[in-house]
Amino acid sequence: MGQRQGKPYRVALLGLYHESNTFIARKTTFEDFQNSHLLRGEEIIAEYRDAYHEIGGMLAVMDREGVEVLPLLFAEATPGGTVTAAAYQRLLNEMTTLLAETLPIDGCLVVPHGAGVSEEQRDMDGHWLGKVRELVGPDVPIVGTIDPHANVSRAMVEATDALIAYRTNPHVDQRDTGRIAGELMIKCLNGTIKPNQCLAKPPVTISIEQQYTAAYPCTLLYEEAAVLMQWPGVLSVSVVLGFPYADVPEMGTSFLVVTDDDRQAGVAVAQRLEALLITHRYAFVGKLETVDAQLAEMYRLEKPILWLDMGDNVGGGSLGDSVVLLKALERDGRLRGFTCIFDPVAVTVLRKYERGAQVKILFGNDYSLGLSHNPYAAEVSVLDKVDGKFRETTPRHGGQVQYDMGETVLVETAAGNVVMIHSLRVPPFSLSQLTSFGLDPAGFDVLIAKGVNAPIAAYGTVCHTIMQANTPGVTQADMTTMEFRVRPKPLFPFEDIST
């Protein structure tokens, strides 16, 4: 049992979770956290105890061991632009105040993303984890999880005893990863292990479309990591793929190894994985296909087709307002498609009309004309007006249960394509986004999802074909076309590292 001197261990639980795309002009505000998940105290337990989320896994272990969990704050916003200084400082102040009021504690479970950037702190996660360490002192174990899209910093590692990355992308093992972190925390509290973390950062970053963990080339790394996990004294081996849309000094792929006080083993394991990635680095550069080439191929493929809009990847920070793929279907006219478009202004206009009304409307943005605002003009029929709330109760990317698109209007274009226009940004991680509002995914030829790999966990259950489209936008697949200022150099594929 999790006890010391006959009393339950006291373990704090807190997290600040954001994947920040520094190429997006629109900043992430405090309101964005409020519109996503800003939970305090028992709200955290109620939301995640039974969820397929890392917090759910942590709680399961703590409950089993009789640990007193002290839930403080969990703040998460949909991936987007850099977090404003005001939003970060407000969240940090609340978090540290709550933690200070809770001391003394025996341990601290933390839930960072690992790719958070604020206006004043490029290494946002390293900064807030460091503040947690300052408060609790050097002897209180800090154990947590990170997203494999983290850009891991030395500061993150130095502030914690153990960080464990999810092993899957799409992320369907978050609850299990939280369980692993919870088990390590119990062992730390009982004094049966003394974690030592080793970080390796090879001069390589992996293209986003090559980060699908169930397929080659990612399987090269994960299969080797599984073998290395069997080494004596190794507690965890994390393959951290990295997030290529954050211009930070820590950008890139990394390997994080946790051992039981065996620094030599940790270094050896990390170096094995580093050498493997460098040797096979060219396999991690994707082959990109144009929209027109994919559209021409669709007629002979089994339907429905999942068409992934990589340039407007909401899970990577994009707005989710691109009409590039919708316009391609509209021009062609032979395939019936579905897509979601974020456009609160269009929603406000459409909400004034009754079901069945024919409306000429401007919505979305045509990124093929550049990054400035170029809305799409169409005549549509209003199908339905809904509140945009839905739930997901199965293991899906992100592990969330409650979703809220805000006020939402379903329309159908003259070409027969159905568009869900919504007022809050929500990534396409759940088929309930369709089924909750009476839409049958199997009734479409093409389902457009604004993502790269993450939507596959949900849409792959109904789509027989998956295609990643090389579309324009702030999450365009070819990161070498983007202007970086502070990323590390040399870094493959930007620079040659053969010498």
Regions found by a protein language model. Name each.
Residues 178, 182-226:
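Conserved anion/nucleotide-ligand pocket segment
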Residues 23-27, 81-84, 120-122, 153-158, ...:
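Short acidic, glycine/serine/threonine-rich loops at helix termini
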Residues 12-19, 23, 33-34, 85-92, ...:
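Active-site histidine-anchored catalytic micro-motif
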Residues 63-67, 97-104, 134-137, 165-168, ...:
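Generic secondary-structure signature for well-ordered alpha-helical cores
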